[in-house]
């Protein structure tokens, strides 16, 4: 399969691309490469394009001949989005429908979109499932949900659309991120021997980056009829930030101090990943 991955030089992409190459796929990575290209080693079946997903002329040149698009590129969380909301909207929302439309016009067969579990907002239900109402708390999350609806409107028997709602990813990658909750706590515990927890009761569903990669591989291998127009949560555990801090302390060392402070960040997510298990047989392992 020939696959275009937007944002393929990012955190998840830097782990996903080598796995796809190992399986024999031909990969094109379209990325601004603002963190450099070295996270992706050269390969005979890998083409790296430094470019912007907002450039529609570029998309029209790049997309022909691809079987699938895996859309990872975005301003990737609330704090980053809020630094420049206009830029965030232009990348996360305004560029989305043109990418989908041009993909379909160029006979791309599958389009997989990386959304976010944050689209649910705060829910009282113990297990939040894919059919529940979206109540996003931020523009970042709202635009993620809006893009899901746009993608679904383009689905057909010849254009298979699938949305993944990842939990907060954690773990090591060549293009490492230290702004994700488990990675933040681990970094501070190791280097400072101290963890500052803001709030602490908020639930954060997490998923290891290896499992995140495997979920995309599983979707790509699944029969189109099973996944067309489907939305899947992907997560491992729904733990509070306090519980995560204790887990990190147990791994890093008993001398690590946990300091709790107040927070106005009331984002709290708790998701069920049963649907992806039932439909395509995917379960987290790490």
How would you name each of these model-derived features?
Residues 3-23:
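N-terminal Rossmann NAD(P)H-binding glycine-rich loop of SDR-like oxidoreductase domains
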Residues 44-55:
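Rossmann-fold cofactor-recognition segment
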Residues 53-91:
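NAD(P)H-binding glycine-rich loop region in Rossmannoid oxidoreductase-like domains
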Residues 54, 83-98, 134, 138, ...:
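Glycine-rich NAD(P)-binding loop of the Rossmann-fold in SDR/ketoreductase-type enzymes
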Residues 71, 97-137:
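Conserved Rossmann-fold NAD(P)-dependent oxidoreductase catalytic core, especially the SDR/UDP-sugar
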Residues 78, 113-126, 139-145, 169-173:
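Conserved catalytic-site region of short-chain dehydrogenase/reductase
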Residues 149-204, 209-217, 248-249:
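NAD(P)-dependent short-chain dehydrogenase/reductase
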Residues 192-193, 198-286:
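C-terminal substrate-binding subdomain of Rossmann-fold SDR/epimerase-dehydratase oxidoreductases
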